[in-house]
Amino acid sequence: MAKKVVGSLKLQIKAGQANPSPPVGPALGQRGINIMEFCKAFNAKTQEMEQGAPVPVVITYYADKSFTFETKTPPASFLLKKAAGLKPQGKRNRAKGSEKPGRQTAGTVTAKQVREIAEAKMKDLSANDVEAAMQIILGSARSIGIEVKG
């Protein structure tokens, strides 16, 4: 007999840096998920990824307190900012886009870089082909004030 699914949980955790402190610990603990077991499994699965990259994860938890999780690719905005060479700044130490997208640019990327990002994100996007995925990535670039050349 299949396990009974109790629910699912979506989190965004930095690759290789899952630990039992907030926000991961409380989110898992109140659902009865073994926090250390998840942290070890997540860190092992994301060790090949760029350390510190935000990784969306969907955790499905069951009535017997077991769980499964699926990692996705980092957000398009993170990949675009990285490709544009935007440096982390501020108290949260994050790269920022333009304060006035459409009026001023925060950086530039090439069409080739947009294609690479679209190909990497293809499995997570609702696009049928790379061209449609590129249009989605171009929209993200426009909304954070990154100009696309070429």
From Swiss-Prot:
Gene3D superfamilies: Ribosomal protein L11, C-terminal domain, Ribosomal protein L11/L12, N-terminal domain. Transmembrane segments: none annotated. The keyword Ribosomal protein applies. Keywords: Methylation, Ribonucleoprotein, Ribosomal protein, RNA-binding, rRNA-binding. One of its GO terms (biological process) is translation. GO terms for cellular component: cytosolic large ribosomal subunit. Residues 83-111 are annotated as: Disordered. Belongs to the universal ribosomal protein uL11 family. Part of the ribosomal stalk of the 50S ribosomal subunit. Interacts with L10 and the large rRNA to form the base of the stalk. L10 forms an elongated spine to which L12 dimers bind in a sequential fashion forming a multimeric L10(L12)X complex. This is Large ribosomal subunit protein uL11. The gene is rplK.
